[in-house]
Swiss-Prot record:
GO terms for cellular component: membrane. PANTHER family: CYTOCHROME P450 77A4, CYTOCHROME P450 98A9. GO terms for molecular function: heme binding; iron ion binding; oxidoreductase activity, acting on paired donors, with incorporation or reduction of molecular oxygen, NAD(P)H as one donor, and incorporation of one atom of oxygen. It holds the Pfam family p450. CDD domains: CYP77_89. The keyword Oxidoreductase applies. The lineage of its organism: Eukaryota, Viridiplantae, Streptophyta, Embryophyta, Tracheophyta. Heme binds at C451. It comes from Glycine max. This is Cytochrome P450 77A3. Its cofactor is heme. Its EC number is 1.14.-.-. Keywords: Heme, Iron, Metal-binding, Monooxygenase, Oxidoreductase.
């Protein structure tokens, strides 16, 4: 059979694209007649609102906020083949995620790249609502993230906090008292999670190498145009090849670590670097409903990667925003330091002390209200067609929740634009971050798909903020600089200008320059 020329290839591809696009458009048009979808900006055939988002020149979350101001609390965006239904109202979110929780508890189909790294949706966050998800989540929550189990890792957290303080001191000595908050906070959290996940003592070089592997995965998972227009996937074969290469490197690097832990628990006392317990220990022989065998090595890699990536950037980002707010609001920083001194005196803050600090809890809750880790919780989908707010929610829709609209809604909060921890002090405003009694803020999602690591993340944030404020007085860099609270998307919502700050040891001690 004769081969096609380059020109023939082009014509064939263009024709296939046109015919497929026409078929898709006609199918979507026939579908749309069946549903009373929420209103939204009119889009183009085939591509929907993709061009409007691109031409706006704004990040997606800013575009969504603009659309919200025009279309209200529930609206639709057509993003190529995806129908996005976006919720921005607390009552609608509560109705969907709490009152109709089981209906909204599943996930939409993933793009092919994500299924590579989730091992075909075999992770807590990616799994569709069903027996696999229930087995994986139950194991993580009951056997790893319960309050009892978390207490067993107190020494790990204490050690990581000591290393964080020393790291900050060393960095300040080398840089005239200036430190890079996010980088240092992120490494401290990652060290904790690595120890919890693998149950092995590791040197910093190995931890940093694991971190590099995890970052490569996150970068590879950045959205692409073919996520919204799968018809274009053939044009992204190079990117898919790169994703497979990153996955291979991830598996090849992590499997030996997994095997080291397996040998350590099979032969107690044989490995002096092994700790008493780890997340891996709960996974080796895990019985997953509907699955005949225990998780494979590749599935273990995906589950461990989820544990590490899911808990690192969200926590570190919260700490960065928290320190920035303390610098911008020195009265809050002073009051927090006074509470710490009053509670522990001269001794080092530990987790039991943190439980006795109501103002610290108010500060952390306020920073999570003002600066949720992401602008959108992980995408939901419905298990069956349903309605919300008088509109149809079809089974193939992506249900998105725009969290800032809820946390900044004046119907929910007094002076929502102000950073004010006092609102949570006794007699002030209340907020249940789990959303069960009502949704006013949702930094970790709500409902059946709420982040399973919520308790762990809040422990880490409280402890880090307490230790960092106890040890140092935090200031702006340069000193006269006004804090810029503009955010940008980098796996989580980070400060657009990464926070550099000055630190001065408490008690009048000077940082050695």
């Amino acid at each position: 059979m004769a081969t096609l020329s380059s020109y023939d290839h082009f014509i064939f591809t263009a024709l296939a694209f046109f015919i497929s696009g026409l078929i898709f458009f006609l199918k979507q048009k026939s579908k749309s007649k069946k549903f009373n979808l929420p209103p939204g900006p009119p889009g183009w055939p085939i591509v929907g609102n993709l061009f409007q988002v691109a031409r706006s020149g704004k990040p997606f979350f800013e575009y969504v906020n603009d659309v919200r101001l025009k279309y209200g609390s529930i609206f639709t965006l057509k993003m190529g083949t995806r129908t996005m239904i976006i919720l921005t109202d607390a009552k609608l979110v509560h109705e969907a995620m709490i009152q109709k929780g089981a209906t909204y508890a599943t996930r939409p189909p993933e793009n092919p790249t994500r299924t590579i790294f989730s091992e075909n949706k075999f992770t807590v966050n990616a799994a569709t609502y069903g027996p696999v998800w229930k087995s994986l989540r139950r194991n993580m929550v009951q056997n790893m993230l319960s309050s009892t189990r978390l207490k067993e890792f107190r020494s790990v957290r204490d050690n990581a906090m000591d290393k964080l303080i020393n790291r900050l001191k060393d960095e300040a000595e080398k840089n005239n008292g200036v430190v890079w908050v996010l980088k240092d906070a992120r490494f401290a959290v990652f060290c904790i999670l690595v120890a919890m996940c693998f149950g092995l003592e590791m040197d910093e070089e190995t931890v940093e190498r694991i971190d590099q592997v995890m970052k490569s995965v996150l970068i590879t998972l950045d959205p692409r145009i073919d996520d919204y227009l799968p018809i274009l996937s053939p044009f992204f074969s190079k990117q898919r090849k790169k994703a497979l290469e990153v996955r291979r490197e991830q598996v090849e690097f992590l499997v030996p670590i997994i095997e080291q832990r397996r040998r350590a628990i099979q032969n107690p006392g044989s490995d002096h670097t092994a700790t008493t317990f780890s997340y891996l220990d709960t996974l080796f022989d895990l019985k997953v409903e509907g699955k005949k065998s225990a998780p494979s090595d590749a599935e273990l890699v995906s589950l461990c990667s989820e544990f590490l990536n899911g808990g690192t950037d969200t926590t570190a980002t919260a700490v960065e925003w928290g320190i920035a707010q303390l610098i911008a609001n020195p009265n809050v920083q002073t009051k927090l330091y006074e509470e710490i001194k009053r509670t522990v005196g001269e001794k080092k803050v530990d987790e039991k002390d943190v439980e006795k600090m109501p103002y610290l809890h108010a500060v952390v809750k306020e920073l999570l209200r003002k600066h949720p880790p992401t602008h959108f919780v992980l995408t939901h989908a419905v298990t069956e067609p349903t309605t919300l707010g008088g509109y149809d929610i079809p089974i193939d829709a992506n249900v998105e929740v725009y969290t800032p609209a809820i946390a900044e809604d004046p119907k929910n909060w007094l002076n929502p634009e102000k950073f004010d921890p006092e609102r949570f002090i006794s007699g002030g405003e209340e907020a249940d971050i789990t959303g069960v009694t009502g949704v006013k803020m949702m930094p970790f999602g709500v409902g059946r798909r709420i982040c399973p690591g919520l308790a762990m993340a809040t422990v880490h944030i409280h402890l880090m903020m307490a230790r960092m404020v106890q040890e140092f007085e935090w200031g702006a860099y340069p000193p006269e600089k006004k804090m810029d609270f503009t955010g940008k998307w980098e796996f989580t919502v980070v400060m657009k200008e990464s926070l550099r700050a000055t630190i001065k040891p408490r008690g009048g001690e000077k940082v050695k320059l």
